[in-house]
C-alpha cells in the first residue's frame, strides 16, 4: 500500500520517514496544499492509515502541488474527466515513478 499526501501537508509521510509510532504522529505546521480534501495537518484516521501502510510493507510519499496539477491535466486530456487535485495525487506519484524508471 502506498499513502500519498501533498508534500507541503504530509504528517503521515513525515511519521513514516521518522519511524514514529502511529499514536505519535505530529501535527504538520503551516500545512498547505491545493488538494484541499487531503489538506489536514493531523488526519483523524492517521494512526490507522500509518499502521496499514506499515503492515502491508508499503510506503508513504508526498507529491508537489505542481505534480498534482500536471496529473489533473493529463487525466482531463486522456480520460475526459476533470478530477480534484487530491484525486490526481496518486497519478502524480505514478508519473514520478514512471519518469525515474
Task: List where the protein language model places each region.
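Catalytic phosphate/nucleotide-handling subdomain of diverse soluble enzymes
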Residues: 91-101
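Conserved phosphate/anionic-ligand binding catalytic regions in large, soluble enzymes, centered on
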Residues: 83-93
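Active-site/ligand-binding loops adjacent to catalytic centers
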Residues: 2-83
Amino acid at each position: 500500500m502506498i499513502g500519498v499526501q501533498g508534500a507541503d501537508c504530509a504528517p503521515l509521510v513525515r511519521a513514516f520517514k521518522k519511524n514514529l509510532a502511529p499514536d505519535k504522529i505530529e501535527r504538520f505546521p503551516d500545512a498547505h496544499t491545493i488538494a484541499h480534501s487531503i489538506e489536514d495537518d493531523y488526519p483523524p484516521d492517521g494512526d490507522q492509515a500509518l499502521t496499514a501502510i506499515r503492515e502491508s510493507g508499503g510506503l508513504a510519499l508526498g507529491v508537489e502541488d505542481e505534480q498534482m496539477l500536471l496529473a489533473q491535466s493529463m487525466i482531463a486530456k486522456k480520460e475526459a474527466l476533470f478530477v480534484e487535485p487530491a484525486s490526481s495525487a496518486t497519478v502524480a506519484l505514478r508519473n514520478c515513478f514512471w519518469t525515474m524508471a
